[in-house]
């Protein structure tokens, strides 16, 4: 009998962002009807310019209409009728928006950067819509309440996969600029180290530049924190430490129901996950090592080898299924995440519906995040990035989700651990450290224009 997991894997519905795909489909109609692929560029320059102008107007009208639908969806959420908006009927997987999104204005900006309306052979793409949504989110943050906290993923967001944040990285001056503006900065990474030295090795370039920066005050330096293991270890900047970081005890930042998680249950869940991982290693003959940590367990390839995507996804799905069917897994809600599968998301949301202001439920619960943080390994972590971002908000005095931006690259593919941050803050979806630099420069431009 075909299982639900195998069907979902085959359909790959969890590899699509439904809102982006829906908007992309709307934009395909004017592209098909108004593009002129047979026109000769030199002979029809005037005609092509007119067509580009007309196409821009039609695209802009679509984004204006979608913006109105988003505003209507937000109004329904505020009135307690989130499931009854027209957008929810059109895109059932659409989630919570913490700010308005200025889509029309964002499209005008990105069209000037990417010349979307002038293209005759390539329709508006997934990446076009993704970047327009990023711009719309930045505009929403600056237009409304302002920005108080920016959190970043590590790999592929601040530095290349498996690399370190070196002193010559162009992202460092942008982070320094955020701190100078009084904006708090958190680095929320899947790397689960219990000591400062490992994080210093990864972030040495940034930490040393901060120490030597004469235009940073001590108060501004203290606005940088590092959350490791998704949501398990917090470190703050400390210039007096040899590694520029100091461990923050859990009781100083743990939030709500996280304090109710029993060590016995955590150990039992990780034991089950480890057993399942070892079974996968044997069954698939994986050339990997098993690593058990305080609040995580996972597998990674030996000798810097590579695993196929199918091997990684099979391992993730097997472990997710095993933990879910265990006694402790059925007793305590958890999140076993492998991309944007409707089942995984709905299972999480049944226990943790998105809220504009987070309020921990009365009953204790526990979450597990099963991810591929580096793209070539599988780790089971207690908690996920929604808890990591919330803990950062709590540490800085309770910053509202509508004043928080999480920047990350993993919102779609298997092991997309940044996806959960959408439950705790606004988000920007980037694809490389270079895009992070562009995003922060765009934010600075918007802040100056609207100041």
Curated annotation (Swiss-Prot):
Mg(2+) binds at residues 153, 155, 409. InterPro entries: HAD-like_sf, ISN1. GO terms for molecular function: ATP binding; IMP 5'-nucleotidase activity; magnesium ion binding. One of its GO terms (biological process) is inosine salvage. The keyword Cell wall biogenesis/degradation does not apply. Its cofactor is Mg(2+). The active site is at 153 (nucleophile), 155 (proton donor). IMP binds at residues 153, 155, 161, 189, 377, 385. The keyword Nucleotide-binding applies. Belongs to the ISN1 family. This is IMP-specific 5'-nucleotidase 1. The gene is isn1.
